[in-house]
UniProtKB/Swiss-Prot annotation:
Gene Ontology biological process terms from the UniProt entry: regulatory ncRNA-mediated heterochromatin formation
UniProt xrefs under Pfam families: Arb2 (PF22749)
MF terms in GO: serine hydrolase activity
Assigned GO CC terms: nucleus
Family, similarity comment: Belongs to the FAM172 family.
Top-rank lineage group of the source organism: Eukaryota
Name of the featured protein: FAM172 family protein homolog CG10038
Length: 325
């Protein structure tokens, strides 16, 4: 599967450490920057140190510690991690998704973007929307620490993309942390989508609603849970009519409004970090969203570890919806 990534760019035999590489502007540039750090993804999507003798990914995994200075280690990690988004974007496109630049009235170089399949959503029979958490992650990522320390499959949304495609879903992938662009010598907020909340609101109002999908499911990780609740509050009629399943993975969110609690308790479930086996019920009140174990104790692992249970839940909810019609 990940051999396709190696075909995009094969690391050169010689490489040097770059002291201050900027974030890459495309996938090839990102892979070159990784090579300058001495790393490359192997055919299984695992980030490994490049063997100087062969120029190919070797056996050694990523090492966080490059210095006795903790600040220098973190600086090195952040610079390397800055190369991840463009690689993931390219993989989304290789898996059949297309970019849509937002807001629509801005030039691409001053816009954010989302990914979808098909390129223009229209009356989807089944639509799956993926919403990541806060921080540095961009479209297609759940946890960049897992991408760097484990594999692309562990930390990206690509396993969700592939499973959704197998099950016949159209796809929409948000990019809620992509809120600024550098020009005129500084970082500038992107007009109309300058915060995560504004980003998902714009996407919902200008892409999802006009597309008039028949049935919608959402998977939202961490702060994506709060963004989803905000959407429910802004577009309650659409949600209650069309959104049949909401899968949270260790969501960071407050209590839903009283008027939406019954609906959310019916369609939503939260897979939380827990030391109990996958799907084990976790304590909750009768008036709250169902919470079950994601099968892992760490927050950043929950989307990866719960994927089979998440899709089982979504498919069962879709079957219930279909049987009501």
């Amino acid at each position: 599967m990940w051999s396709r990534l190696i075909q995009i760019f094969r690391p050169l035999r010689s490489f040097r450490m770059s002291h201050s590489p900027p974030p890459a502007s495309n996938c090839e540039e990102a892979l070159i920057q990784l090579k300058n750090f001495g790393y490359a993804f192997d055919g299984e999507g695992v980030l490994r140190k490049v063997d100087p003798a062969t120029g190919e990914p070797g056996k050694e995994l990523f090492s966080y510690n490059v210095s006795d200075d903790a600040a220098e280690n973190e600086k090195h990690y952040q610079k390397l991690a800055n190369q991840i988004p463009e690689i993931v974007y390219a993989l989304l496109e290789k898996n059949g998704l297309s970019r849509t630049y937002i807001p629509f009235d801005q030039p691409p170089e001053r816009s954010s973007f989302v990914f979808s399949q098909p390129a223009k959503l229209s009356q989807s029979k089944k639509l799956l929307v993926l919403i990541h958490g806060s921080g540095y992650v961009k479209a297609g990522q759940w946890a960049r620490s897992l991408i760097i320390n484990n594999s692309l499959d562990h930390g990206t949304q690509l396993p969700y993309v592939r499973q959704a495609q197998k099950l016949g879903y159209d796809l929409l992938i948000t990019n809620a942390n992509d809120c600024t662009r550098f020009y005129n010598g500084k970082e500038n907020p992107i007009k109309g989508v300058n915060t995560s909340v504004e980003h998902v609101k714009y996407v919902w109002k200008n892409i999802v609603l006009p597309a008039k999908p028949e049935s919608v499911a959402i998977v939202a990780h961490s702060y994506g849970g709060s963004l989803t609740l905000d959407l429910v509050e802004r577009f309650p009629d659409f949600f209650k009519e069309s959104v049949f399943a909401i899968a949270f993975t260790d969501a960071a969110m407050g209590s839903p409004q009283a008027k939406n609690k019954e609906y959310l308790c019916d369609v939503a479930c939260d897979w939380v970090a827990s030391n109990t086996p996958l799907d084990t019920p976790v304590s909750q009140s009768k008036s709250s969203i169902r919470r079950i174990s994601a099968g892992h104790t760490k927050h950043e692992w929950t989307s990866y570890s719960a994927i089979d249970s998440v899709f089982k839940f979504i498919e069962e909810k879709y079957e219930q919806r279909a049987n009501k019609k």
